[in-house]
Regions:
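Transmembrane helix-loop junctions in multi-pass membrane proteins
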Residues: 18-31, 102, 114, 172-188, ...
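Extracellular loop-to-transmembrane helix junctions
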Residues: 30-50, 108-138, 148, 191-203, ...
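Flexible loop linkers connecting adjacent transmembrane helices
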Residues: 53-81, 107, 121, 130-159, ...
Length: 776
């Protein structure tokens, strides 16, 4: 009977997912409620996490709570540091949830809501979440090694070096694009600059609070951070409206670009517990809070999806971007379903701070499901706009003209309608001077979110407030990915440079950390500055490569994941990664080939460059270029795009071929499967500690934790306050401290717990020693 109720709940959840997907896929001829898409997504995520992720956790990796993690084994207080699972989840989610799940589904809405909804829901359960989980678990078992290191050790030297160079190049492109999006979102916006900027000192305060003043008091630090964040939101609005401070914090895009470079460098060299983890944890509260509020708003408003299920633009004639629904819907959505960038975070910062192995399931698989929910909500917000409003905001001026009237005529020719008067009124209501041809996805998403929020919570009078809040939310969403990405890029650069000079690869040598951080920031910072100062060159020309590079990186990660599973002797489970790998390779290679060689100038890099070259040869300036020099710059950029795309594709082909060869030699018995996992070591926190009334240490297994009753929790809080006031030894703080600190050795060399007397003497002495001492 005890199992009957849970089973019935899961059956109902699965049924709701199937019904929701059926309605989304089969209903035609009229708009459907967004509730169907939301129901299908949420129920599918719950079923996938409960059953599909459990196969990976139990059958493939057999995650063990008693196994020591890299954060304990290599604890250095900077990069390796045992961290509370909720803070790790917050950091991980904040790091992976960048512009992809917001902008990608918004742009892909030009195909209709159906292709995007199906791919986001199915793709994440079978592909994206699997990749993140497998790479995270693999890295944890290998002392937190990066994706490039694992490729070298698991697949081979050639594939490893190819992966290191290719992944580093892809990372430079990805981080520069992320930084450019932040600059465009915050440029000349004092509200956003002040609010986002204040999250940095707030994070420093939280990090110091949990490190020195109240270790492991996560809830207290969280409450302080949330209160200060609310203050920061209102402070940003106050500064923006102030006649003196408003212009003072209205920064130019070039100034903001330098500021972002400085921040990226600081986030890479400072200890992870001081800035990166608490700031991402704080940002995760904003992200998750807004996501929950948006989902709640959709449930309250139940907006109809005005965009058709499938539009005529599936043939590749779309005005927002060129390309057919296959493969470009999957390339454009990117992070909403699967993202190669996540593999860098899952093998970068996250495995180095994970405290318990079983948390990898919740953080790796669950974190990706949460990001997919963000993509679903972004798709709903975009499709809740009328098609006329959507295309008026997202289509370029070349397709719409420069006036609302010309845009209405162009949209009418596409089979949709736009009322110029209503569109002008919408522009005024959101507090913008212009919404027409605000391409990129972010403005239209902000309009959709603001409309849902205002209808659900405040009324149309606060539309401008909600719009600017959404813009700030998008900028905050992206910036957290930039700082974690910079740190991961530093790890990768150290992996590469250690072959030239070994000390540069030592993460424990601080000069190497500073040097490689400065080098990596200079790499993406150069392209960022070029993109900010020259709209025709720099990173702007590399934007079309963002989706392709990201998905090719996911292919590399799945190759590594498949190899790890086979070498573990679990080849019967290799289909978990082989299925998404096969699909992803077919999609990305098709998209890359079309972007390079397509004869359609709107799609192919080389054909577009040829049009401009022929025009210059005839002595005329081609359409779309302001001068002959600008035309030459566009030609260079197109050819650079083609060369970079070809290099990335070739690198992935090399890695895929090397992986297939490794799989064949192992499965055919020609080569023994040698695992590179770190041998099992018992975790320092394998046995939870508690103290009885006399202070005697009692070991209890983790699985036998008991819930505190309310009175006991109250007495515990009072006791903690007394400890702080009178300075008495705090046994719980000691128990938390020894999870990451070596215990003393007895005469035989075995680790033993300190006695209560030793503990009290040490704890009292620590009160008068420097901050950061053991048990402090």
């Amino acid at each position: 009977m005890r199992r009957l109720v849970p089973n019935l709940i899961w059956i109902a959840c699965g049924t709701a997912a199937v019904v929701g997907l059926g309605v989304v896929a089969l209903k035609r001829g009229e708009s459907i409620s967004a509730a169907w898409v939301l129901t299908a997504a949420v129920c599918s995520y719950l079923v996938a996490f409960r059953f599909y992720s459990k196969i990976i956790a139990a059958k493939v990796f057999a995650l063990d709570a008693t196994r020591r993690t890299p954060s304990e084994r290599l604890n250095d207080g900077r990069d390796y540091c045992p961290t509370n699972r909720w803070i790790v989840f917050g950091h991980h989610f904040a790091a992976i949830a960048g512009p992809g799940p917001l902008v990608g589904p918004t742009l892909a809405a030009q195909f209709g809501y159906l292709p995007g909804a199906i791919w986001i829901i199915v793709g994440v359960a079978l592909g994206g979440a699997v990749q993140d989980f497998v790479i995270l678990a693999s890295s944890v078992r290998r002392n937190g090694k990066t994706l490039g290191q694992m490729a070298k050790e698991e697949i081979g030297t050639v594939a490893g070096y190819t992966a290191l160079v290719a992944v580093l190049g892809i990372m430079i492109v990805l981080i520069a694009v992320l930084a450019l999006v932040v600059v465009n979102a915050l440029g000349e916006s004092p509200w956003g600059i002040v609010t986002v900027g204040l999250t940095i000192p707030i994070a420093l305060l939280m990090g110091a609070y949990m490190r020195w003043f109240r270790p492991e008091k996560v809830l207290e630090a969280t409450a302080i951070g949330i209160v200060l964040l609310i203050v920061a939101l209102y402070a940003g609005r106050w500064v923006a409206e102030h006649p003196v401070y408003g212009p003072m914090f209205t920064l130019q895009r070039t100034t903001l670009a330098w500021a972002i470079m400085i921040y990226g460098f600081a986030a890479s060299v400072l200890p992870v517990w001081l800035l990166l983890a608490p700031r991402d944890y704080l940002s995760a509260f904003v992200k998750i809070g807004v996501v929950i509020a948006l989902a709640l708003g959709i449930v309250i408003v139940l907006p109809p999806l005005h965009m058709p299920a499938v539009t005529q633009f599936v043939d590749g004639s779309g005005p927002v971007f060129a390309g057919k629904v296959f493969p470009f819907a999957f390339i454009t959505i990117a992070c909403g379903a699967i993202s190669g960038f996540h593999a860098l975070i899952s093998s970068g910062t996250t495995p180095k701070i994970l405290q318990r192995e079983p948390d990898a399931r919740f953080i790796g698989y669950g974190g990706m499901l949460m990001e997919s929910l963000v993509a679903t909500l972004a798709l709903i917000a975009a499709c809740a706009l009328t098609p006329g409003e959507y295309f008026a905001i997202n289509a370029p001026a070349a397709a719409l003209g420069t006036t609302v009237e010309s845009a209405a005529e162009a949209i009418r020719n596409w089979g949709f309608t736009l009322d110029p008067a209503q569109f002008n009124a919408l522009t005024q209501q959101v507090g913008e001077q212009r919404l027409l041809s605000r391409t990129g996805g972010a403005p239209s998403l902000a309009v959709g979110m603001a409309t849902i929020f205002s209808n659900a919570f405040s009324g149309s009078g606060a539309l401008a407030l909600w719009y600017h809040f959404a813009i700030m939310f998008e900028a905050l969403f992206i910036l957290t990915t930039l700082d974690a990405g910079t740190r991961v890029g530093r790890f990768m650069l150290q992996d590469l440079l250690k072959h030239a000079w070994a000390p540069l690869g030592r993460i424990s040598w601080y000069p190497a950390v500073v040097i490689t951080s400065a080098m990596f920031v200079a790499m993406w910072g150069y392209f960022l500055y070029q993109g900010v100062t020259d709209p025709l060159g720099g990173i702007n020309s590399l934007w079309p490569l963002f989706g392709i590079a990201n998905q090719l990186l996911a292919s590399v990660a799945l190759c590594v994941g498949t190899t790890v599973i086979i070498k573990m002797g679990k080849a019967r489970f290799a289909w978990l990664t082989l299925v998404p790998l096969a699909w992803l390779v077919s999609v990305t290679m098709t998209a890359g080939y079309q972007k390079i060689f397509s004869p359609e100038p709107r799609l192919g890099f080389l054909s577009h460059a040829r049009i401009f070259t022929d025009a210059l040869a005839e002595g005329r300036i081609p359409a779309g270029a302001a001068s002959a020099d600008a035309a030459r710059q566009i030609i260079f950029n197109d050819r650079l795009d083609a060369a970079v795309a070809a290099f990335f594709m070739l690198a992935v082909i090399v890695i895929l071929a090397a992986s297939a060869r490794e799989w064949w030699t192992i499965l055919s018995g020609r080569k023994a499967a040698v695992s590179t996992e770190v041998p099992y070591e018992p975790a320092l926190a394998a046995a939870m500690l508690r103290a009885d009334s006399l202070g005697t240490v009692v070991a209890t297994e983790p699985a036998r934790r008991t819930r505190r009753l309310a009175p006991r929790a109250l007495f515990g809080a009072i006791g903690s306050a007394v400890h702080v006031i009178i300075g008495a030894p705090d046994w719980r703080r000691y128990a938390n401290a020894i999870r990451s600190m070596p215990r003393r050795l007895d005469a035989g060399g075995a680790e033993v717990l300190a006695t209560p007397t030793e503990f009290a003497a040490e704890r009292l002495a620590a009160r008068y020693s420097k901050p950061g001492s053991r048990c402090c």
